[in-house]
Structures are given as C-alpha cells and as structure tokens.
C-alpha cells in the first residue's frame, strides 16, 4: 500500500484475519488434525465467523482462503511442486503475502528469499535449488504426510479369492 501498488480487498482481508486463522489452526492441530486439514478447517471457521459480522462477498472469501492455503503449499518445494506453484493463478498474491509475513517478523527460515531467488533463476539453477533443499534443512524432511496402506484396485482381495475358489 505504501508503495502504491494494487492491493485487492481479498488480500487485505487475508492479512487482517491471518492472526485469527493461526490461532484457529493451532487449536485444530491440538485436536489431532494434520496441518493442512487444520488450516482448511480454520479458514472455513474464520470466514464463517466473519460473514456473521461483516458482509464479505464470496468473490473475496474464495481468494482469501486460497492465499492462506498457498502459504502452506509454498513451504513444500520438493520435486516439481515449486514449478507447478509458479504456474498457479494466485501465486503472486500468495508470494506477496509470504513476504509480508516475513516483514511482520514471522520466522519462515528465509522462505520468501528462496522464492524470490527461484523466480529469477534459470531452469538449471532451479533444479540445483530444489536438489539443495534437503541439505539446507540439515537433511531433515517434513514427513507429516499420512501413509496409506496398499490400495486394491478392483478384483477380489487375496483372502476372498482363496475362499471363492474353495
């Protein structure tokens, strides 16, 4: 705003409600939800509560929620995720929001600078940046993903096949 750049109402609402969203997300995570589901639940709750107080049109609430959800996705840069993120329609808003969060004092481990450098890099440099992600984080990966058991795509289960043949 100070630099007289265009700022959408959705971006402003996302910024104003960010602390409330973070509180709701922490509460949902304490209830046992994985981080991304907690974020989604918190976003829905914050938006529904705000709609009761002030009229926020859907054309603003949907981009708000997308900006919030992309904050989580911006931290997941492995594989082809970073390149796909650059193609996202709301990448620029999410990136600007990320920089704003860093300027406000959130410790995001230089994530904003990484994305700034990534955008300016050529394809070879981008590949190198992605390959170095694990090394920069001390080799630790975020393995909060849920693991699913093997999927059976059609056909009887092995136990059923034996009983059907008998």
Model-derived regions: residue spans:
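Catalytic cores of the polymerase beta-like nucleotidyltransferase superfamily
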Residues: 1-166
């Amino acid at each position: 705003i100070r630099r007289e750049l265009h700022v959408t109402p959705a971006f402003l609402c996302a910024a104003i409600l960010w602390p409330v969203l973070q509180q709701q997300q922490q509460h949902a995570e304490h209830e046992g939800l994985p981080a991304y589901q907690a974020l989604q639940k918190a976003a829905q709750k914050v938006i529904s509560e705000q709609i009761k107080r002030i009229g926020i049109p859907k054309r603003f609430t949907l981009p708000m929620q997308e900006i919030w959800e992309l904050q989580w996705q911006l931290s997941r840069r492995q594989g082809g995720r970073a390149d796909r993120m650059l193609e996202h329609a709301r990448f620029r808003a999410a990136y600007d929001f990320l920089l704003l969060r860093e300027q406000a004092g959130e410790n995001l481990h230089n994530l904003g600078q990484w994305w700034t450098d990534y955008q300016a890099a050529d394809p070879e440099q981008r590949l190198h940046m992605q390959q170095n992600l694990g090394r920069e984080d001390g080799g630790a990966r975020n393995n909060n993903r849920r693991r699913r058991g093997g999927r059976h795509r059609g056909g009887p289960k092995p136990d059923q096949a034996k009983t059907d043949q008998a």
